[in-house]
């Protein structure tokens, strides 16, 4: 909830919807503590990566970057990999750009 700046009930509803639509939710752990998560939708011709969130207490320590690196090495990940990032999330843009991702399309609206 804190990683997305959402109320607990909204976070639960978001995760339940993700389970219902067949997306994969990956937990990011450090020392036995879940510090974040990332959601993927793996299709035959691409993988959509979205919903990467790290708890504020653990942000800036490389957990998000490391999680993306690990995911990209998973054998069931298909390429290309697309990202869904809000324009205001400058930190995420910087991380993804540093990993070699490029902006190919911008959406005016996005919702779940």
Regions found by a protein language model. Give the residues of each.
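Active-site acidic-Proline motif in GNAT/NAT acetyltransferases
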Residues: 42, 55-57, 61, 87-88
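Structural preference for beta-strand elements that scaffold enzyme active sites
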Residues: 46, 80-82
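Conserved acetyl-CoA-binding loop-helix of GNAT-fold acetyltransferases
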Residues: 54, 60-73, 93-98
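Conserved beta-strand-loop-alpha-helix junction that forms the acyl-donor binding cleft
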Residues: 82-93, 109-112
